[in-house]
Amino acid sequence: YGTDHYGMSYPVHLTAWGYGQMSALLSYLMVPFIKVFGLNPVSARLPQLIVSLLGLAALYLFSRDAFGRKAALVIFAFGAIAPWHIMQSRWALDCNLYPHFFLFGIFFLNRSLKAGRRKLLLCLSMVMFGLCMYCYGVSIYTMPLFLIMACVYLLIKKQVKLWEAFMAFAVWLAVAWPFILVM
């Protein structure tokens, strides 16, 4: 228990198709559903559906913060009926988690800039961005680049202090470090 077929304990990347690597987060999210419902299409697809629905909620909340309630309702409606969103919420494909966890990170980062619980929300955003690393292999390039650009922008605009940027980086690194070690 807790090992792949090569004997690696709780691997960060799973071997797929005999040679390639597959992001592990979706597989780990499936475990409790497979335990409860058995191995079937519903238990394999349910985690993706739940994350997709939470992604729609995060899209609405972020849009409401950024553009107001009316615009957020329109954005939410288009997101809910978008063919891409409908299809990706049905497929148990590991990379389909990435846009949702990225959106969760953006949502919490945006809230951290406005809210009273600034440090908690900033750390939560970095946890979400760190989990992005386990959703899609290309995140090894996109996440550090995005975080560096966001950090520079927020420091220039004086929306975060230098010590907050270091704290955020430490949280992101703590979550992403196992992934970075095996890449």
Per-range role (PLM):
Residues 67, 103-124, 129-132:
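Membrane-interface transmembrane helices that cradle and orient dolichyl/undecaprenyl
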Residues 23-31, 36-57, 76, 88-91:
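Loop-to-helix entry region of an early transmembrane alpha helix in multi-pass inner-membrane enzymes
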Residues 46-67, 104, 108:
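Transmembrane-helix motifs of polytopic, lipid-linked glycan transferases
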Residues 59-81:
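Transmembrane-helix signature of polytopic, membrane-embedded enzymes
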